[in-house]
Amino acid sequence: MHIRTTEQFPYSVIEEDLRIPMPDGTRLYARVWRPDIAGPEHPVPVLLEYLPYRLSDWTAPRDAQRHPWYAGHGYASVRVDVRGQGNSEGLPGDEYDETELADGVAVLEWLAAQPWSTGRTGMFGISWGGFNSLQLAARAPESLHAVVTVCSADDRYDNDVHYTGGSVLAVDMHAWASTMLAFFSRPPDPRHIGDDWRDMWRQRLEALDPLIHTWLDHQTRDDYWKHGSVCEDYSAIQAPVLAVGGWHDPYRDTVLRLVEHLPREGTAPVRGLIGPWSHQYPDRGLPPGPAIGFLQETLRWWDHWLKDEDTGVLEEPLLRSWISESHPPATVYPELPGRWVGDARWPSAGVTMTTWGLPGAASAGPVLVRSPQHTGVDAGRYFPFGNDSDLPPDQREEDSRSVCFDYDPLAEPLEILGRPRVRLRLTSEVPRGQVIARVCDVAPDGSSTLVTRGVLNLSARHGRDRVVDWEPGATEDVELDLNGIGHAFPAGHRIRLALSSAYWPWVWPQPGSAAGWSVEPAASALDLPVRDAVAAGDAERPAITFEEPEQAEPLDVRYPEVPGQRPERVVVRDVAADEWRLEVDPRYGGTRIYPDGLEFTEDALETYTIGASDPGSARTRSDWSIRLRRPELGWDVRIRVRSEITADGADFRTWNEVVCAEGETEVFRRCWERRIPRTAG
């Protein structure tokens, strides 16, 4: 899709770098884009994006397309680096810790008090910035009048990168912890900081502690995870929220929960928007599309709440969502076929949870589900970013490693919208295990497209805040909610429910997972949220449309070609050892050269290994390298991070190493090794 670049705005834009003082004297690095009229005579509302990702380089290309656009439409748009990151002073902390959130409140107060500010602020962001926008809204700072949160979560334990269904999310807990260790090791930029950069860097390095330690120390939903989880008290959010997600983003269920639990009307209402997108802003044009004019859509939100203009945002349905038409399996889709629908309430009057008994249940006895441990190698990327190998390929191989229940071919089309639920009667002979359920769209040619899935750690079946081991030999009924989805099954296709006892590397295998478990089909069912267009009132509502994507002029960043680039995603089988290895290049950025002369190179490789019959053989490894170079200053810094995780029945074992060099001289090296008791995950 073509993305229009806009160079002419209603207002000319002024860009300025600032240091924002915190109550303890620490200064946070900020960049503000303001309309040229902004001042005491013509104050403007302020928008804040607050991230740890380095505004002077890492997010600079994205920032250049968004913040000047808002400024050109009459807002002061501000990007701030979190304490201890980028060119901000102080030491790095944990995700969304108390210091970060207290600083965020102070930043909003400072921005509201500036002579060019009306005193009304809005906050927006994707992922981390979407998280802390919600978290700060729950603190109800006086100036915060509106929020746009994109691809974020209301539940830090069960809907983030650490745990899923009570199980350790092996694929992303480790990868993200290693990424953060590499990111936290980056120095300030001497072009912006001057000679103090080296002392600041040394202080940051000495304060490092791998976050994987903390995350594995908290294997159930305790107070650590409740901090920053706005689902603990939705009523604390006192600002209007536009919640945005994509069906191919792991955080999409947060949008469904927010539109259910936040008020539809009043002084702080919510509106939800879920498209076909991955973990990206909806206007970037990255697969899967279609992209939308997201900046224009958010401008309507800001103008309504920060300028008191009637833009019609409250006349929109509570939830606007994309329902994808059936499509052949592929690892990337430039655009998906489908349509936009609107629902005035959530749960919607147009959606009915319909029970589907398992096929053949009347004549079937207990069925053993005992999957090989490499089931899951075709799961696709947990965080799709629009890369060529992100999405799950044809699921037939995964289905062959699972127990599948195929329904009869549909006599007529069937649309679902929401979160399917699977109810199972299980018998397990071991105390620990996990259930993975997938719903697939099976075409007449046999191809199997993943529609949605879900995970349950059986020891978390009575709640994510407790561990209840299974009594060997006992039979119990369990339920698991699958991820939300909007999907249209066509007539002639089959719906498939696939059950497995392993899903590597998404789920770290439990010690007894090789034993599997038995399911009683006659006492089990699949519940589907079936949407009826008539009951939903589609014909009575104007068609849902969006403008074409539009952005400010892109930053002139050069990306030199890298010869011999390795594949993004490779599955290797060692036949003699019966071992499977998944190698992933997350494509974080390669080499780029910025207009100010900075050369920035990143490389990452993730490796996930497991034996087909041995859950104790699971191993994850992450290798990171970063180089920052300014030839005109003689500045050349290199960072290397290596980390591994293994586990047995009793403990997780972690190993992390950080090595930093200035030029050819090593200036820092530290290694951490820990054994962490395996209490739940």
Q: What annotation goes with each model-predicted range?
A:
Residues 2-42, 406, 410-412:
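N-terminal cap/lid segment of alpha/beta-hydrolase-fold proteins
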Residues 63-64, 72, 138-236:
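Accessory cap/linker subdomain of secreted extracellular hydrolases
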Residues 115-127:
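Alpha/beta-hydrolase fold nucleophile elbow
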Residues 126-135:
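Glycine-rich nucleophile elbow surrounding the catalytic serine of serine-hydrolase chemistry
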Residues 237, 243-245:
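Short beta-strand/loop motif that positions the catalytic acidic residue
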Residues 273, 281, 287-661, 665-681:
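C-terminal, loop-rich substrate-recognition/catalytic regions characterized by aromatic stacking residues
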